[in-house]
A protein has these predicted regions:
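ABC ATPase "signature
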Residues: 220-221
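Helix-to-loop junction immediately C-terminal to a conserved catalytic motif
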Residues: 59
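Conserved ABC transporter NBD signature motif
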Residues: 67-82
Length: 252
């Protein structure tokens, strides 16, 4: 359960020297950064930058070629009942298409040792009606699947959320809802690592920004630090950094 993070708390996530290659091709190269408790950290980069690979390594779905990731003090896979401490949404389309939305949540609640009514509470929290909860997840729109995925991430009342593009498919009202939810989660002491292409929303909600390009960290700092003197805000910073990275690759 989120609560105020004590001063001097260790990082919620610590990534150190992370590298991953596929078939000899580097996808992530010597990536290091931390996610501090009680904050929203934005993880930004163009398509193919290595964001999703890094997130999959964090939660034990992909093995790194080198380096390590500590989630709440150790490997994610070593956490007992990890859903009670870390909420994860990497791919909203990965939900069982043949099960009703409520059933997806109720089964996970059972695995976590939570009462079945928790499924109903989470459906309400993310704005899915009881009737929508009885529909098969395969019949959901992308926006509804995203809401179900966020409900699943919140199911165990975790202290940390790891979310990959959770706003995909949400309409403007849904994006505003998600931004408010994440900001309130962090303000209550929770921690969020958020990957998103929605730069304006990221600028509005993130406390800290990590920009990745070509599998390497291009920038890492507080939002205030990185945007100081940048008239065009996060969009200008992002385009400037990624354009410079592209030029460096061409020159190399």
């Amino acid at each position: 359960m989120p609560g105020s993070a004590p001063t001097g708390s260790p990082p919620a996530i610590e990534v150190a020297g992370l590298s991953k290659t596929y078939g000899g091709q580097p996808v992530v190269t010597d990536v290091s950064f931390t996610v501090q408790p009680g904050s929203v950290t934005g993880f930004l980069g163009p398509n193919g930058a290595g964001k999703s690979t890094a997130l999959r390594i964090m939660v034990g779905l992909t093995r790194p070629t080198a380096g390590r990731v500590a989630v709440l003090g150790g490997p994610y896979t070593a956490l007992p009942n990890p859903g009670r401490r870390v909420g994860v949404l990497l791919d909203a389309s990965a939900q069982h298409a043949g099960r009703a939305g409520r059933e997806v949540l109720a089964l996970s609640a059972l695995v976590m040792g939570l009462p079945e009514q928790r499924a109903d509470e989470m459906l309400e929290r993310v704005g899915l009606s009881p009737a929508e909860g009885r529909r098969r997840a395969g019949a959901y729109s992308l926006g509804m699947r995203q809401r179900l995925g966020i409900a699943h991430a919140l199911l165990g009342d975790p202290e940390l959320l790891i979310l990959d593009e959770p706003a995909n498919g949400l309409d403007p009202a849904g994006i505003h809802w998600m931004r408010t939810l994440l900001r309130e989660f962090a303000d209550r002491g929770g921690t969020v690592l958020l990957s998103s292409h929605l730069l304006r929303e990221m600028e509005a909600v993130a406390d800290h920004l990590v920009v990745i390009g070509g599998g390497r960290i291009l920038a890492d700092g507080s939002r205030a630090e990185l945007l100081s003197g940048v008239d065009g805000g996060l969009e200008e910073l992002f385009l400037r950094l990624t354009a410079a990275d592209t030029r460096a690759e061409v020159a190399g």
